[in-house]
Curated annotation (Swiss-Prot):
Belongs to the ABC transporter superfamily. The lineage of its organism: Bacteria, Pseudomonadati, Pseudomonadota, Alphaproteobacteria, Hyphomicrobiales. Gene3D superfamilies: P-loop containing nucleotide triphosphate hydrolases. It holds the Pfam family ABC_tran. It comes from Bartonella quintana (strain Toulouse). This is Putative ABC transporter ATP-binding protein BQ02700. Probably part of an ABC transporter complex. Responsible for energy coupling to the transport system.
Length: 226
């Protein structure tokens, strides 16, 4: 069983304290992170794969320290941004899916195999040679997710992956997340989507205010927000 640990983690940007003395262990398969804007939730998930490093305290993934073992952690933890344009780096779909794989020292045959598998799994074969910038927002997000899944990390972090999407594409992306074999940590405001998760962390002013199963956490979150 994998485990992500935060040990007395504080995150400060200038004079602003974004996270305060966070100690928590994450072992569940589906974990949601919610809270008001500015509550610290995005900073929290960015610490998991080393996109940001803690000002104080320690973050580890399966025993690997995000500071000391940065490269190994990034291979274990994939990250999907809210805006796929922040993640897509090459002009064609197939090229973009291959990009990250080339950093894993895989053979050309293995890269091609993984790309073909991903294209088929997510019904993207027809877009294989398409320019990414011509795709819809939902299709772009699917390409961004696919590029991470193809690298076969143990964990995937999603920072509000459906916020910019219409209802149809939002449903498609949430379905993809639900079917992932990997552990998923998801920042989202879509409470309906999160009802089937294993655990929800609610952030408020840089602290974990609620940590419970969805039925309890969502009810308490709504009560506090009303």
């Amino acid at each position: 069983m994998g485990i992500i640990k935060f040990d007395k983690v504080t995150q400060v940007f200038g004079d602003l304290c974004v996270l305060r003395d966070i100690t928590v262990q994450l072992t569940e398969k589906r974990i949601a992170v919610i809270g008001a804007n500015g509550s610290g939730k995005s900073t929290f998930v960015r610490l998991i794969n080393g996109l940001q490093l803690p000002s104080n305290g320690f973050v580890s993934v399966d025993g690997l320290d995000t500071k000391r073992d940065a490269k190994a952690v990034k291979r274990k933890v994939g990250f999907v941004f809210q805006n796929p344009d922040n993640q897509i780096v090459l002009p064609l779909v197939e090229e973009d899916l291959s990009f990250g794989l080339k950093n894993l020292n895989l053979s050309k045959d293995e890269i091609k195999k993984r790309v073909d598998e991903i294209l088929q799994r997510y019904d993207l074969q027809a877009f294989k040679n398409h320019a990414v910038h011509l795709l819809s927002g939902g299709q772009k997000q699917l390409v961004a997710i696919s590029s991470v899944v193809a690298m076969k990390p143990d964990y995937i972090v999603f920072d509000e992956p459906t916020t910019l999407l219409d209802l149809r594409n939002k449903r498609r992306v949430t379905q993809v997340i639900e079917e992932l074999p990997q552990t998923a940590i998801v920042v989202s405001h879509d409470l309906e989507f999160l009802k089937n998760f294993d655990r929800i962390l609610v952030f408020d002013k840089g602290e974990i205010a609620i940590d419970d199963v969805p039925l309890v956490a969502i009810k308490e979150y709504i009560r506090r927000m009303s």
